[in-house]
Amino acid sequence: MRDKLTERFDRMMKVLFRQEGANLEIGILASEEAQDFIEAHSSVLNGSFRKVEMSETMRKRLERSNYVFSGLKTFHELNEAFPSLLDENGNRKTFERFLNDVRKIDETYNSNYLRAEFTFVQASAEMAAKWERFMQDGDRYYLQYRTAGDAKVRPTHAEMAGITLPASDPFWAEFYPPNGWGCRCSVVQVRKSKYPPTDHEEAMARGKSALEVDKKGMFRFNAGMEQKTMPDYNPYTIKRCKDCDMNNGNMKLVFVPENELCAACKLVRTLANADAKQIKKQAKPLQGTVITNNEFPFRFDKLIKS
């Protein structure tokens, strides 16, 4: 699959190389080549939970989440590759030199970062499937936070071990695992007669203390509750994305400001819902939109290590 991604990345770079002007056109995301790349990347993520049992509705929503995430990541890659079209003197490079110069982008995003993303999506999907089963029982049982119980457990995550609360407690909306890159924590149902509930305020305090390292608040989400593999605020978005109507499916109500990330996000979400011919028409007004958002990209390598 790595070779297929690189092959599609190269094809997408050919389309990027043909662009004229000083600004990256967001409409490139609707091109056949970009769509092939986004779908291939999304398919890799989907493969992480192919054997996980869940309802078809949940699976489709998680797969859609992967598509949106992959689309915004692709936007990032195009954004990073675009300046490499010109050499140090401002002259257009040959395609061979350009492709060689952007090869490190492919390696960084679609090998290094993808490994961490694959593991996170897999954990999110497994926990989303669990949440779906938990909801069938309502508050009949308590839910209890568990770590992997070995020497690799982060001390911060160990702070939450044993927290026991009803499924309806707001704690689970913020601190349901996975709680970071490579998090192996889980949640299980326990009998109310066997385990006393944790005080809500105490649980919230322990959760906030445990995730203090996540100062951006990226991992404060519940994959099962939101039916998404990745939080709306992730390395390829900005903080206010958490409260955007688009993330709640209200596409028609959204006012898209003069912001290239918002425009790209709306296009990607529309692409997830429509066929290519319709999208190519809708993408035309976005051509020429400038990509100059100072709020991203985050240093993803640092986030993985945190």
Regions found by a protein language model. Name each.
Residues 1-106, 191-306:
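N-terminal leader/targeting and assembly helices and adjacent pre-domain segments
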Residues 121-195:
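Conserved short secondary-structure elements within globular domains
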